[in-house]
Design a protein with these regions (language model features):
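A cross-taxonomic marker for long C-terminal extensions/tails that follow the last structured domain
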Residues: 337-348
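N-terminal [4Fe-4S]-dependent radical SAM core
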Residues: 60-142, 154-161
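Generic secondary-structure signature for well-ordered alpha-helical cores
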Residues: 99-102, 150, 154, 265, ...
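Long, charge-rich boundary regions
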Residues: 124-167, 175-194
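Conserved AdoMet/S-adenosylmethionine-binding subsite of the radical SAM
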Residues: 169-322, 328
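Short alpha-helix
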Residues: 327-338
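N-terminal alpha-helical interaction blocks
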Residues: 1-80, 86
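Conserved acidic residues
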Residues: 95, 150, 233
Length: 348
């Protein structure tokens, strides 16, 4: 990790920092302390009704818990158990992401992400290359993706859904515990959306307090947004495109702007946000400008990471206009846009 002499500790990740230092419990531990009885075989609408009621108890408990000592013990049957049950049912008609393919992944049918019910990861390690406030970050790279980014730097992982190591939730929970003992500041789930069912099971088996990072393209369904509240501490979210046309052209994503802004708004009320804006060559006016404007007007109290790491990889050559690195003038223009907008908590 290269030291940034201009680095300032984030303003709007205050709760995360307290969880990281074991001064507050992670949200998933609070959910696991909320007791409720339910039948996992009940119809999905009935389970959602119970979930909505239990989330009211969760929110009240979140306000009450001001230290680790305030955390009640795990419930025999908990809100987190209910979240696991709901995610497991959604697998039968998959709508984890907003493509809403409807595949029965339990029967090995697949949708756009090409994943069945078995989650796999390609690597897990203490990552030193994330944002300074996150490192060392216990980063777990899941295989598969619901995007098809032409310039994906991890294309060998994202486009090979059947590669990697099959996940046994209890085993990975033990690995997370070990990494935490070795100094990880968080557990960082990368490309998590298609694996929501598995991640909830991992957290339900986890015994250690650790901040949960949802490292995502933010293109998940309303239902998944509801499950993530009460589980995720920091939404490490990409906001790449300022319009639907660019999203469709470079990532084959429909209705990008509505879905992603909706999910950022929901995350803003239920957790903390570290937003990544990867500046694309030739896309200052169409993407960076509207993103910065929207953030300032709608979710101003977030950590904003303006990123200049774009490199033309994978199939970027199919789009000559992005088959190059950023020019210095583009970098300076993006910096000026963010500064003039007055976004307060910026990482560059």
């Amino acid at each position: 990790m290269i030291m940034n002499l201009n680095y300032r500790e984030p303003i709007y990740l205050a709760r995360y920092l307290k969880v990281m230092r074991d001064r507050l419990p992670s949200q998933f531990l609070i959910s696991r302390s909320v007791s409720l009885d339910f039948n996992k075989d009940s119809p999905l609408p009935e389970l959602w009704g119970l979930h909505d009621d239990a989330m009211k108890s969760f929110r009240g408990r979140m306000e009450f818990v001001s230290s680790m000592h305030d955390l009640p013990p795990p419930a025999v049957s908990s809100l987190l158990d209910l979240k696991v049950a709901i995610a497991n049912k959604i697998l039968e008609n998959c709508h984890f992401c907003e493509r809403r393919c409807g595949a029965n992944r339990k029967k090995k049918r697949t949708g756009y992400c090409r994943l069945d019910a078995v989650s796999r990861y390609s690597a897990e390690f203490l990552h030193q290359g994330e944002e300074p406030e996150l490192v060392p970050s216990h980063t777990i790279f899941f295989t598969g993706c619901n995007f098809r980014c032409a310039y994906c730097q991890n294309w060998d992982i994202s486009q090979a859904p059947r590669s990697g190591i099959p996940i046994l939730p209890q085993e990975l929970a033990r690995t997370i515990t070990l990494r935490r003992a070795y100094g990880s500041r968080n557990v960082n789930f990368v490309t998590p959306t298609p694996h929501t069912h598995t991640i909830l099971k991992i957290l339900n088996a986890l015994k250690v307090n650790v901040p949960v990072i949802w490292n995502s393209n933010m293109y998940y369904s309303r239902e998944i947004a509801g499950l993530l509240e009460g589980v995720v501490d920091v939404y490490l979210g990409d906001m790449r495109y300022g319009n639907d046309e660019c999203a469709k052209k470079y990532s084959n994503v429909p209705d990008y702007w509505n879905v992603v802004t909706r999910n950022f708004m929901k995350a803003y009320t239920g957790g903390e946000i570290l937003l990544r804006q990867l500046v694309l060559p030739g896309h200052i006016e169409c993407c960076t400008v509207p993103i910065v404007k929207w953030v300032k007007e709608n979710i101003p109290k977030i950590r904003f990471n303006l990123m200049f790491q774009y490199r033309p990889t994978y199939r970027a050559y199919e789009h000559p206009e992005i088959n190059r690195s950023l020019m210095p003038v583009e970098i300076q223009k993006a910096l000026d846009i963010v500064r003039e907008a007055g976004i307060e908590d910026v990482l560059i």
